[in-house]
Each structure stands twice: as C-alpha cells, then as structure tokens.
Amino acid sequence: MSENGLPRGPSAPTLVQTLRWLVAPIELMESCRRRYGDAFSLTFLGFGSPMVLLSDPEVLRELYSGRPAAAGARNGAASGEHTLPPGRTVSLLPIMGAGSLLLLEGAEHLERRRLMLPPFHGERLRAYETAIREIAVAEVDRWRGGESFAVHERMRAITLEAILRVVFGVTDEGRLTRLRELVPQLMADTSSLSLSFRVLLAQRLGRVSPLEHLGGLREEIDLLLFAEIAERRALGVERDDVLSLLLAARFEDGSAIGDRELRDHLVTLLLAGHETTATALAWTFELLLRNRGALETLLASLEEGDDSYLRAVISESLRLRPVVPLAGRRLGRDLDAGGLHLPAGTDVTPAIWLTHTRPDLYPAPYEFRPERFLDSTPPPFAWIPFGGGVRRCLGAAFAELEMRIVIETVLSRVELSGASRGEERIARRNVTFAPRHGVRVRVLRRRADSRGRAASAIGPTA
C-alpha cells in the first residue's frame, strides 16, 4: 500500500501518467500489473484523486454487487451506491446531456433504466433482425472484388444506419441524409487524441465546458432529433422502434418522458451504441483474418446452419479486444474483497483488459481461441466486456445480435483477406480501444451463392 492507503502505482507526475494513458494504455497497464499486481493506482488529469484499477474477479464481484439506491434518493452516494467519478462527467455532459443514462445516479438512474431496458431484450429484439440484415446486405453488396478499404469505416456505416432506422425509426430521407453526414463528424471530433488534450487542459484551467467548439454540430443534430420527436408525437402511430416505445413509456406517476430527456437518451444511444459495435466488429474481422483456422471453422459451421461457433468467436473477440477498457466508479461504501480494503470515496475502475488476459482464467491469454467459449463459460466476473451490475451496458443483447447478423452477412457474400502486415495495434479513441489503422482488408471475390444465405445461421435471439 502507498502512503495514502491505496494500492501502489507509478510515481511519475500526473501529467506523465496521463500522457502514457492517452498514447500507450495497454503498455501502461501491463507494466503496472507486472510490478504491482491485481490492483494499482494511477493519477489522471481532471480526476483530482488517484484511480484504482482492479482486475481480480473476486474484487469485481463485490464492486458490481453495489446495493440499489434507496427509493427517492437522487444521489446514489447517499444510499451507499457507487457513483460516477466527477472527472467522467466533464467530457460527456456537454454532448450527452444531463438526462443521459450514462450520467444519471441513484434512484433516478434505476427508474430510467427500467423504462429503457425492454426494447433491447427478449422478443423485442426479434423485430429488429430483418431490418439489420437488410442494412448489412445493402452495404456489403456495394463492395467489389479487388477493392481495399478500412473495414472499421464500413462497419460504422452499418451500425449508424441501424441506430437511425432500427432504434430511432427515422424514415424522413432528408433527416436521415443529414444525420448520416453530421454524426460521423461529431464522432471524429470527440474521438481525436488532440481533443483529449484539450479536454484535459480545460479541466486544468477550470473551464466549465471544454467542448464549445462542437456546439454547432451538436445543435444541428439536436434540431433534427427534436423535429423527429415532435413529428412522432403528433402522429401518435404505434411502431416497434425504440423511440416509439420510449414515447409510449410512462413513469410510475403516469408522466411521459420529456423532449429534452428523450433527446439526451437518443444522443447517448447514437454515440455510445453505434461506435462501440462498429469497433467490436472491426476487431472481430481483424482477428479472424489473422487466424485462418478459426475463420475456416466459422465458415464451415455457418454452412451447416450452426451459429454456436459464431457466438464463440464474438465472445473471444470481446475478451481479447474489449472496446471500452475502463468504467470508473466512486465507492459509496467501503470495499473489502480479495485481501483488499478500499474506503468509501475511492475512485476505482475494473481494468477489463487485464481481467480478460489473466492466465489463471484464460490459458495462453493473448491467443485468439474461440473454442474457449464452446463447452464452458468463464467464471463470474471474468468476462465483462459490457461491464456489470446496475450499469451493465443496456444494449448488450442488441449489440451481440447485430454482430452475429453483420459477420454472417459479410462472410456469406464476400471473401476477404487482410491488406496489412502483422497485428493491428490498439489505439485509444476517447473512451474506446480501437484499431489504429481501421483494419485494412481486400475483397478477394464475391461469393456466387451468397443471396438468401444471410439469415440461415442466425439462431434464436438470446
């Protein structure tokens, strides 16, 4: 333990640690694990106090089992619930809005989560399969033999279209066209390394909003979303998309979700939903194209109409390349587990990458082995790409369904090869770990028997 009673960590100045995290996060975490073990502290600009990174599943079990907020308690910390570290809100609030589920706390967060959960689970998901498949087929059918491109960009196009048409239910072509133009611009601006430096500098200087320069983009997107909300309220037609279901949802007191809060939820789904799934898809193709044995096994299983290996491929890809590596919390009560004692008020985060690469949990942890997930499941809290507890990713089931459909559609219609030598390096993009060069691929040929096969291997929705 260090002098402040927290797990030890690097003694380098906060600025140096922050720069190392921004530029080489994997190397930083790996070196700290080798030196300090399963729990260590890092200091980041903008967070004020050290952040303790945790990778022991026993400790994560205790962290994720945080008690629900007391009824009526808006501030989760007042009831012993773990809350968000203040530093996290600085970069998210100006874009997501105060009503974003990512930023709400306590009973307010739980109430909103209960309202938003049903559209992303169970039978509701089945209504989205055909539309997602049509979007994927339309994109892949534009690919030509001999063409080379960064697959990450093509996956972004698919997942953005799925959010706009399947989740939002936008049908106005002018609105769709403008959102297709604006959202990638906003994502590029909020994901750049230079923006990270500007945000940290703004925090250091005490500026209220470090993202004013994005205001124009945000305002134009807001106008389009408010127009969609107003139009849908006026029509009052029952539909299966998520926006329609949220418009019809009611709180316990019978009131509806207001326009501003709806906007915040939609922007959160838009920015958090499509980019993370696109990144996960890009990583999956990168891993498959570097591991031809796994690719051939997957193709053979899909030919037989069996999607069990596809599900295993996705699970292994999310293990080896978790898209969101950290999910910070401020402890609302003491945490005692795995021989570790952390007092209430400590900022902590699961180090998902480190948990997923523990050799005691995953033999040969840096190798891509989908077979790990065929006949067994990892121990509790050893596989956490979607987080856990009351803040587990709301759209996890939707994302996995979308990944299954897109991967099967691509592999059934084209044959790909990697267009880059060696392993794609991990780059930090805002809160995600993305492929540094976008995963360059080449279309070797189109498959002659591709039409009609895209739905054949996708099993029942979980």
Question: Positions of the model-derived regions?
Answer:
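Conserved cytochrome P450 K-helix/beta-meander segment immediately N-terminal to the heme-binding cysteine loop
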Residues: 68, 350-376
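Cytochrome P450 catalytic-core helices
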Residues: 276-301, 397-414
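Cytochrome P450 proximal C-terminal region
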Residues: 6, 33-34, 136, 184-185, ...
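Cytochrome P450 heme-thiolate monooxygenase catalytic core
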Residues: 1-6, 72-93, 108-110, 124-279
